From Swiss-Prot:
Residues 62-85, 103-117, 190-212, 242-251 have a biased composition (Low complexity). Residues 492-496 are annotated as: G2. Residues 86-102, 159-169 have a biased composition (Pro residues). The lineage of its organism: Bacteria, Bacillati, Actinomycetota, Actinomycetes, Propionibacteriales. This is Translation initiation factor IF-2. Residues 517-520 are annotated as: G3. It is found in: Cytoplasm. Residues 335-346 have a biased composition (Basic residues). Signal peptide: none annotated.
Length: 964
């Protein structure tokens, strides 16, 4: 509802704008002009004050007003339509009113409201009350059906219409603010909205009535809208009439169900104004009237359904169940619905609904199902498998103490912990199974020969030479091949895997044997494992002078794990200290029993230097292959094999040393090797000769790949380059995720808090570049095993094969990393850029040199540990005062040396009084830097002067302690 302006209200109340402004100022309300608007509470107070102060006359009684009469009387006229429905009647007759209105009267009609405009019955639906309109006289209550229907033309004000006399003995009712009338039952339909009369000029508002159209909970808003309520009529005697007027209940007795369903009393139910306008309180409690509506204003009691009063028509309402009234601008409406929740309850329910759950979010848990995930899978991959949201899984892991993003690769242990929390069995697919599933999606298969037995032909055996470092493996192969590979190896040790083919004559037949040379250093464990998996027979080389060494046992275990037969070559028998029988006895403890001892393992004594026993070794290899193995393959199928080594050649690009296991590789074939793919441009055998094809068990160097494959990657020939590229890209994505999950050292919340307490952790970042993929892999694995404590961390941020490029230098400059070059050098532009950016590049040709220097660098990054070292002691024998330097201690040096600016502590009676330092030191009149034992001196302490005779000054220094 719009706000009322001053001049409109003045016109309505019959005052001038100036008078109304004065009254507003007297009330303490500041209003600027007559065009200003007034808030609804001020309008209400103003109307109450003017209504109680001004006398009522006949002219004002004819004007429409919002106040109700406090007298209850039996109406003989019907209510006419107004802009707002009249309040429903409440039972109980009122006292007899006087014919003329008197100001301040408690029983007569009020000013501004004609007593003839009141009825004793509940208003009918559709009828709209018009204040000041002449009410037609109604027949007696015994004949309610003869009551005429009002017409629009009857809405003419009749100020002096006599009010009918009420029934004697009926008590008057007190007004109840906010009461809303129910529609009169049995009445005709209301006028259309266009035909409804507007507000009467000069009409005042009802005292205490809520403003219509301002109730947010009302089903209908606006002035003059009627509500269809249940029918209620007067009760005459014991009879009830459906559409007639009901007689008020005599004697003020309680109406039916007077107290049932009533709301709890609250301050809104109390009368707003205690003035002469308020009539007498009822002596009894009436029932709730008006059906669903309110039967009228309440009296001083709280029963509800009271009749009469200044805000309701005279007469009793139906003593039945009432509904809630419409809430106005100030105060609550009628009785609330049953089960209505308080604001506190609603707030509590809302808080409980929004409160976080203890222990994590709600995620659908499984029933122990098995979920297969690839290695390095993310939480998004797991969420797709179990039909959950990735954000929920992130929250679950956070509650478990792990901080992981939705797309970050997760380690296997973390996935298993998360699966156990959600009641799922997480099964991490092995790389072999994952690669098999990938190839099956392209209708490919690796590892099986195609065709039947008639398509299989004999192939040479593949022999891997294994053993401890410096036991003569490469020298033995040089003797077999009549070459000198050892001379070209840095440090005299093999740091790359190599493949060669040797021709030998066995039983007057030329036989080919393929040898694979593996490194013996402990850093090349992965290479030895790959060599054992790619071989048919393992030759275990043991030096006769050293015996069984750690890498000998490791190579033995690799061969047993690959389930390949083993031939033992006892080397260096030409040395005087050689003891082949000792070697046989040691290997017997590991399950290798010689044939001469009743076992099944062939032992051959050889000397790579004198070529003694080489033919016996070749014969033993061939006999073992023929006796224990079925060495056949299909040469007509698409080639498949393994890349045992790979490197980046400056002139030829990526070069892979491949061992053909089945099929025949031709120039022009589309191949995919790990995450690399390409077309075979050229093939070179172990003698350096170009070949057009490679048969099974033949080692060749393959050129034409787009990148350097990983050492040990399987390769196979596919139909076209497109399929090869798709397989390579999928493998690369899988390897990247697995590498991230493996290399990322994720901290838990507890570890993070501990780190924050201790301070930042020093970290050494490395970029590894090598000449071969196997060498880089071996170097990275060896560096990962370095452990110097929790204060320093080592992390490899990039790795690659080939020369050091400008990209590597840029990354190192941006991340403050160190570049490690293993048998490689930077390009000219990269070297110039490294000099400009002050990037540190370290070059190594032997792997253990790199490991030792990097470990030393890590130890140098450790925070130093200091320990206290005593320097000397001085005894204070006399104290001097000086205005320049303060208190001077005259001392005798009793032990060691006292130096100026050295740390010192003042000790009194064996108790440390102060930690300070020597500020000044003087002997006689000369300032000195130190004073030795047996001499006197004068000294002052920094920021301390409370010294006594007999105190000791102990001088010391902090010396760095070397870290282990």
């Amino acid at each position: 509802m719009a706000k009322v302006r001053v001049y409109e209200l003045a016109k309505e109340l019959g005052l001038s704008s100036k008078q109304l402004l004065g009254k507003l100022n007297d009330m303490g309300e500041f209003v600027r002009s007559a065009s200003s608007t007034i808030e609804a509470p001020v309008v209400r107070r103003l109307r109450d004050q003017i209504g109680s102060a001004e006398p009522a006359d006949d002219a004002k009684a004819a004007k429409p007003a919002a106040r109700k009469s406090q007298t209850s009387s039996k109406k003989t006229s019907k209510e006419t339509t107004t802009a707002k429905p009249a309040p429903g009647p409440k039972p109980g007759p009122g006292p007899k009113p006087t014919p003329g209105p008197r100001p301040g009267s408690s029983s007569g009609p009020k000013p501004g409201r004609s007593s003839a405009a009141r009825t004793s019955a509940t208003p009918r639906p559709g009828l709209i009350k018009s204040s000041g309109a002449s009410s037609q006289q109604e027949p007696p209550a015994a004949k309610p059906e003869s009551k005429p229907t009002p017409k629009p033309g009857q809405n003419v004000p009749k100020p002096h219409a006599p009010a009918p006399k009420p029934k004697p003995g009926a008590p008057s009712k007190s007004p109840k603010p906010g009461a809303r009338p129910g529609p009169r039952p049995g009445g005709s339909a209301g006028l259309p909205s266009a035909a409804r009369p507007g507000p009467r000029p000069g009409a005042g508002r009802r005292t205490g009535a809520p403003r219509p159209g301002n109730n947010p909970f009302a089903s209908s808003q606006g002035m003059g809208q009627s509500r269809h309520r249940s029918e209620g009529g007067q009760r005459s005697g014991g009879s009830r009439s459906g559409q007639g007027e009901r007689m008020p209940r005599p004697g003020g007795s309680q109406g039916s169900r007077g107290g049932s369903g009533m709301p709890r009393p609250n301050p809104a139910m109390m009368p707003k104004h205690q003035s002469s306008q308020i009539g007498q309180a009822t002596t009894g409690r009436g029932g709730r009237g008006g059906g669903r509506g309110r039967g009228g204003s309440r009296g001083s009691g709280f029963g509800g359904g009271f009749g009469g009063g200044p805000r309701g028509p005279i007469g009793g309402g139906r003593g039945g169940r009432g509904g809630r009234g419409t809430q106005g601008a100030f105060g609550r409406g009628g009785g609330g619905r049953r089960g209505r929740k308080s604001r506190k309850q609603r707030r509590q329910e809302f808080d409980e609904m929004q409160a976080p759950l203890v222990g994590g979010v709600r995620v659908r848990k499984g029933n122990g199902e098995t979920v297969r995930l690839r290695r390095g899978a993310s939480l998004t991959d797991l969420a797709e498998k179990i039909n959950a949201e990735p954000a929920q899984l992130v929250q679950v892991l956070f509650n478990l103490g792990e901080m992981v993003t939705a797309t970050q690769s997760v380690s296997d242990d973390t996935l298993e912990i998360l699966g156990g929390e959600l009641n799922y069995q997480i099964q991490v697919v092995s790389p072999e199974d994952e690669d098999r599933e990938l190839l099956e999606s392209f209708d490919l298969e690796f590892g099986e020969d195609e065709g039947d037995d008639s398509d299989l032909v004999a192939r040479p055996p593949v022999v891997t030479v294994m053993g401890h470092v410096d036991h003569g493996k490469t020298k033995l192969l040089d003797a077999l091949r009549h070459t000198d590979v050892v001379k070209g190896e840095a440090g005299g040790i093999t740091q790359a895997i190599g493949a060669y083919q040797v021709q030998t004559e066995v039983d007057d037949a030329e036989r080919a044997i393929t040898f694979i040379d593996t490194p013996g250093h402990e850093a090349f464990t992965a290479m030895r494992a790959r060599g054992a998996q790619s071989t048919d027979i393992a030759v275990l080389v043991v030096a006769a002078d050293d015996g069984v060494m750690p890498q000998t046992v490791e190579a033995l275990n690799h061969a047993k794990a690959a389930d390949v037969p083993i031939v033992v070559a006892v080397n260096k028998i030409d040395k005087p200290e050689a003891d082949p029988d000792k070697v046989r006895g040691q290997l017997t403890e590991y399950g290798l029993v010689p044939e001469e001892y009743g076992g099944d393992t062939m032992f051959v004594n050889v000397s790579a230097r004198t070529h003694e026993g080489l033919d016996d070794l070749l014969e033993a290899i061939v006999l073992t292959a023929d006796a224990a193995l079925d060495l056949r393959a299909n040469p007509d199928m698409a080639a498949q094999g393994v890349a045992i080594e790979a490197h980046l050649d400056k002139g030829r690009g990526p070069v892979a040393t491949a061992l053909i296991q089945r099929g025949t590789l031709h120039i022009g074939d589309s191949i995919v090797a790990g995450s690399s793919y390409g077309r075979v441009r050229a093939m070179i055998n172990d003698q350096g000769e170009s070949v057009d094809e490679a048969a099974p068990a033949t080692p060749v160097q393959v050129l034409g790949l787009t990148s350097v494959p990983g050492a040990g990657d399987n390769f196979l020939v596919v139909d076209d380059d497109r399929k090869a590229r798709q397989i390579a890209e999928k493998r690369e994505a899988r390897m990247r995720a697995a590498q991230q999950a493996r290399s990322s050292r994720r901290k838990t919340l507890d570890q993070l808090f501990e780190q924050l307490e201790k301070g930042e952790t020093e970290e050494l970042l490395l970029i590894l570049k090598g000449d071969g993929a196997g060498s880089v892999e071996a170097l990275e694995d060896a560096l990962a095993k370095i452990d110097v404590g929790d204060e320093v961390d080592l992390r490899v941020i990039d790795r690659g094969v080939g020369a050091i490029t400008e990209t590597n230098v840029s990354l190192a400059a941006a991340s403050n990393a160190v570049i490690v070059g293993f048998n490689v050098r930077p390009t000219a532009h990269a070297q110039r850029m490294a000099d400009e950016e002050n990037v540190d590049i370290r070059y190594y040709s032997v792997i253990y040199d790199a490991i030792d220097e990097i470990e030393a660098a890590l130890r140098g990054m450790l925070k130093p540990i200091y320990e206290e070292k005593a320097m000397g002691t001085a005894e204070i024998r006399q104290i001097f005062r000086s205005s320049k330097v303060g208190t001077i201690a005259g001392c005798m040096i009793t032990d060691g040396t006292i130096r100026r600016h050295a740390k010192a502590r003042l000790v009194r009676d064996g108790v440390v009084v102060q930690e300070t330092e020597i500020n000044t030191l003087q002997r006689e009149k000369d300032a000195v830097t130190e004073v030795r034992e047996g001499y006197e001196c004068g000294l002052t302490l920094t920021n301390y002067s409370d010294i006594h005779v007999g105190d000791e000054v102990q001088c010391y220094e902090m010396v760095e302690k070397p870290r282990d």
